[in-house]
Amino acid sequence: MKAKLHVLFLCGWYPSEVLPTNGDFIMRHAKAVNLKHQVSVLHIISKPGISKTTIEIEKNLNFNVYIAYIKPSINPFTKLFRFWSAYQSLLKQIGVFDVVHLNKLYPFGLFALHLKRTKKIPFIISEHWTGYHLTDKKKLSWIEVFLSKKIAKKASAICPVSNDLKNSMLKNKLTGNYQIVPNVVDTTLFKSINETSKTFTITHISSLLEPHKNISGMLRVAKQLENQLDSFVWNFIGGNGHQFKALIKSLNFKKGQINFIEHVEHEKIPAYLNASDIFVLFSNYENLPCVILESFSCGTPVISTNVGGI
């Protein structure tokens, strides 16, 4: 193997103008790989309001990002053609590379399969998607299952972030060479600074999606905490919380201060974790959340439901 490889990160999820935080954990993984190897990121996403495909390229020494924005379409064949054309255009810009690092097996795995068959370039898969768990199995279409099996079979390695995710993928008959590779943490950013808060502070950080993250369950727990604590603050970071206003009103908090903070830049998250007495995750299903590892790195204790890869 070459001492230094040129790795193509083929990403169905990646931060962009359309979704600035989508797949930010993949970006951090790519930057971790870039510590040892050259990395090029390829991402394609539909962007409302444009009339034709546009390409944006960001080059920074050995870490280059290539994003194509395509005109949206409800016609699946038109959408497929636009994605394929954008993919071909980006490949020309990127040039020669040694290996493909596919993030999320489907649908971008079809591109990885194409590169293996036409250019003999091997690929590995990093998988993060909770959709493989049995609770979400109904969301997988037959064509996705069929093609995913083909992609998984041809991968040199399949790297789920937890053993639990591996088991869920195997239950979906996605066989292959499995190697568990957890999510990454920037320990130069997430570190303990021994900051304390006068008021007992609890923090939760997520997408705040109710079926997944169980925000309503945490709010009910917060109400019960009023029987134990004279005062406390519970920060929910990741959304405005509008959908929980009725529940919060009905719970009628007297001692607890509930804050919903819509967006916090990743670089500022350590300050919230360091100012917290505890981090809480109440999910109904999970893989291996980055934020738990980041909390540990800051020295902040974690309370979590015992689900998935946690």
Predicted regions and their residues:
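Short alpha-helical donor nucleotide-sugar binding micro-motif in glycosyltransferases
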Residues: 152, 263-264, 271-276
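Membrane-proximal helix-turn-helix segments that form the acceptor-binding/catalytic region
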Residues: 28-31, 141-158
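Nucleotide-activated donor-binding/catalytic signature segment of Leloir-type glycosyltransferases, i.e.
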Residues: 246-264
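Short hydrophobic beta-strand element within catalytic cores of glycosyltransferases
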Residues: 301-304
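Conserved donor-binding/catalytic core segment of Leloir-type glycosyltransferases
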Residues: 8, 195-213, 219-223, 235
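Carbohydrate-associated surface elements
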Residues: 164, 184
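Aromatic "clamp/platform" in nucleotide-sugar-dependent glycosyltransferases that forms part
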Residues: 284
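N-terminal subdomain of nucleotide-sugar transferases
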Residues: 1-56
